[in-house]
Amino acid sequence: MGNLKCLNKQKANFNKDNKVNSELKKISLNKSFQTITTLFKKQNIISMIDLKNKSELRNNTLIKSKEFKKNIVQKLEQKLNKDPYLAPDSLSAYTLMNDIMIQSVSEIVSKYMFPLVSPTKGENISIVAVGGYGRAEMAPYSDIDLLFLTPYKQTAWGENVIETILYILWDLGLKVGHSVRNINESLRIAKNDITARTSLLENRLIFGDVELANQLNKRLWKEVFSKSAPEFIEKKLEERNLRHQKQGAERYLLEPNIKEGKGGLRDLQTLYWISKYVYKISNKKDLIKYKIFTKDDLEIFFKAEDFLWTIRCALHI
């Protein structure tokens, strides 16, 4: 993917000012999507809403967010219909579109619909993308998995904010799965549930308290990931074998499952997950550094990945 960095400004904390926090990860968009990137910048959802009109704030947020989504989706689908092989590069564009909607809705809900006069530390919340959304690989109609991370037990304010955000996102037609947990709960579940642990392996802060999200990651690596590599490898390989049996343990099927079948996207992801878990790599190119792949191997890996994403995106639209 290209080097163009373009992530919409993100609010650093629910309860603080609107300063941009440079620590938040950025999404890279390929130059093929430069015109759409410009559209992202121009269409600031919050600027299109009368924030003083409290009685219509929820409805107006929904209307303007739907307009934004419809416009961007139309542009992206036109581009993919014209050139299906741009599909791998579109994953970041779809991710960014969802990021902007979630950030905008979250800021409006937390700051204008449920303003706090005297916020406490207990009201800090981080909205964290996990799973495929966390690694910024979003096909046109992929599910969005979110972790609403709280420092302690959830407050009444937090319940209202999270519930309102979710209902607006659902009304937007987004397929959002979610969990609401504090750090200790997240660690406990990660230790006991391999699926939850895998999804947390690739988490990404979307909105909210940066320090809270950083604390989660530090403790995940210290208390969970670094102590359980052999178990993780065994579980993921066992999971792969069961998946292959279910889908038909053959490479060449008349109607293969692009995601779950043998040699499909999930197999490529499993290889990367294991490598990330063991070596704490943050980029697939690091697979060469740790001698998991040769340069030629990595090129084959990327070609296979691009091909499978091209098919999957084509099936989505």
Task: Label each residue range with its predicted role.
Residues 2-317:
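A nucleotide- and high-energy phosphate-metabolite-utilizing enzyme signature
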